[in-house]
Amino acid sequence: FGGIEGVMRGKGELLDYLQTHGGTAFYSSESEYLAQMIGKRKGLQAVPYSTAGMTAAEKGNYLTVRKGATEIRTHLVGDYNIGNVAAAIAVGGHFGVPEQQIVAAIESYEPDNNRSQRKAGARNTLIMDAYNANPSSMRAALANFAKEPSEQPKAVVLGDMGELGKYAEAEHAGIVELLQQLGIGEVYLVGKLFSEAGRGIYPAFADAAALNEYLQEHPIHGRLILVKGSRTMKLESVAERL
């Protein structure tokens, strides 16, 4: 999309399509940008949702969400996923699905596409979030990972975030600064942008293949590892090595 403006333009195209074809937009009312975009499209059917009145907690390895007297035990990792739970509740409610069935559906969902997916392997435990990455999702994932209790030492593998346009260098530098603030000591950076941002601070690799070569010579064992980056970085190949 070439930057934030491109992302908003793309969302606008989706809203225009829904408006033209009589569709319904479900959107977070906590997003000022989306609320403004919805407001400008008169006649568009729109259903807002929010996390107001919802609380999130990590119980065991996964996210548990409470809304009033209702508790939802998900198979998702990270309290930042509370917004996704709110969206699912809104969609189900709009189409008249009983609350009990909505809860059961959310609780039965187990990610298998490298999105908030926890994998316990023979060598390490992985939190795979390598399908997509942007500055806000990466900051949220890192902050959640840093505070997660773990008997295993922690490590992070981060791949470049794509489609940031003129903001790319600054956003990657900001993530490196956040890593230092969070005190996550074992970090592996993958991609041109992170290599530049983390030069002299963390080990950096041109691509996933280069990191895999390093890991073959320097295997990692007994870690809890967050793996996050844009899909184009192909970090799932690193997960196989870990």
Feature names for model-found ranges:
Residues 1-4, 85, 138-139, 168-173, ...:
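Conserved strand-to-helix beginnings and helix N-cap segments that scaffold or border functional pockets
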Residues 1-125, 151, 177-180, 185-186, ...:
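Acidic, Mg2+-coordinating active-site environments of NTP-dependent enzymes
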Residues 24, 125-128, 155-156, 224:
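Hydrophobic "anchor" residues on beta-strands that sit immediately upstream
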Residues 34-35, 212, 235-236:
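Short, well-ordered alpha-helical microsegments
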Residues 49, 202-214:
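Short acidic-hydrophobic, aromatic-tinged amphipathic segments that line or gate anion-handling sites
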Residues 87, 220-228:
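Short SAM/SAH-binding signature in class I
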Residues 111-114, 130-203, 230:
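Active-site beta-alpha connecting loops in nucleotide-dependent enzymes
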Residues 113-117, 232, 236-240:
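ATP-dependent carboxylate/acyl-activation modules
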